[in-house]
UniProtKB/Swiss-Prot annotation:
Pfam family, one: Ribosomal_L5e
An MF annotation (GO) of this entry: 5S rRNA binding
Keywords: Ribonucleoprotein, Ribosomal protein, RNA-binding, rRNA-binding
Name assigned to this protein: Large ribosomal subunit protein uL18
Family membership noted in the UniProt record: Belongs to the universal ribosomal protein uL18 family.
Function: This is one of the proteins that bind and probably mediate the attachment of the 5S RNA into the large ribosomal subunit, where it forms part of the central protuberance.
Quaternary context: Part of the 50S ribosomal subunit. Contacts the 5S and 23S rRNAs.
Keyword Kinase: no
Source organism (scientific name): Halobacterium salinarum (strain ATCC 700922 / JCM 11081 / NRC-1) (Halobacterium halobium)
GO biological process: ribosomal large subunit assembly; translation
InterPro entries the UniProt entry points to: Rbsml_uL18_euk (IPR005485)
Annotated GO CC locations: cytosolic large ribosomal subunit
Length: 183
C-alpha cells in the first residue's frame, strides 16, 4: 500500500468494490428515479430508488422470492425469474406513481441478454418508461425459458431430477406472468 502525504485513501464503498461513483453521479444527474437491478446466483432484486438530500429512498421493490405468491415454483435465479421480478417491481412502481426511470446495473457487466436487462424488459412491459436499446434485450423465447426446457429435455432422467420439471417452464412462465398482470 502506498504511503506518504500525497496518498489518498479511496472511499470505503470503492475499496470494497461495491460502488462506481462516476457511474452513480451520471445516473443522479439525470434527475429520474433509478431502476436498480441486482443479481446473485440464487435470486434477483429490482428496486425503484429516488435520490434526495437525506439519501436514497426506495419507492418500490421486488425480490425473486416474492414470485412464490404468484405461483412461481421454478428456481428464482434464472432469466425468466428476472423478467418476472422486473415486471412485479414495475407494477409496484406504477402503482406508487412512478412513470419513468433509468437503469442502474451497478458493477454488473452490460452483456446483451443478461438478467439485468431482463429486469429492465419486465419493468418496461409493466408500463415504466425506461430508455433502452432493443439490441440488449433477450429474445422472447429465452425470456420465457425455452432454452432451459430444451436443455432439460436433452438430459438423461437419472441426471435430471428435482422439485420442478423444467420442461414445462415456458408454460409455467406464461401462467405466472398472467397472474402478475392481473394483480
Amino acid at each position: 500500500m502506498a504511503t506518504g502525504p500525497r496518498y489518498k485513501v479511496p472511499m470505503r464503498r470503492r475499496r470494497e468494490v461495491r460502488t462506481d461513483y462516476h457511474q452513480r453521479l451520471r445516473l443522479l444527474k439525470s434527475g429520474k428515479p433509478r431502476l436498480v437491478a441486482r443479481k446473485s446466483n440464487k435470486h434477483v432484486t429490482a428496486q425503484l430508488v429516488t435520490t434526495g438530500p437525506d439519501g436514497d429512498e426506495t419507492v418500490a421493490s421486488a425480490h425473486s422470492s416474492d414470485l412464490d405468491a404468484y405461483g412461481w415454483a421454478a428456481p428464482t435465479g434464472n432469466l425468466p425469474a428476472a423478467y418476472l421480478t422486473g415486471l412485479l417491481a414495475g407494477q409496484r412502481a406504477v402503482d406508487a406513481g412512478v412513470e419513468e426511470a433509468v437503469l442502474d446495473i451497478g458493477l454488473n457487466t452490460a452483456t446483451p441478454g443478461s438478467k439485468v436487462f431482463a429486469i429492465q424488459e419486465g419493468a418496461i412491459d409493466a408500463g415504466l418508461d425506461v430508455p433502452h436499446n432493443d439490441s440488449v434485450l433477450a429474445d422472447w423465447s429465452r425470456t420465457r425459458g425455452e432454452h432451459i426446457a430444451e436443455y432439460a429435455e436433452s438430459l438423461d432422467e437419472p441426471l435430471y431430477s428435482g422439485d420442478f420439471d423444467a420442461t414445462a417452464l415456458p408454460a409455467h412462465f406464461d401462467e405466472t406472468r398472467e397472474a402478475i398482470m392481473e394483480d
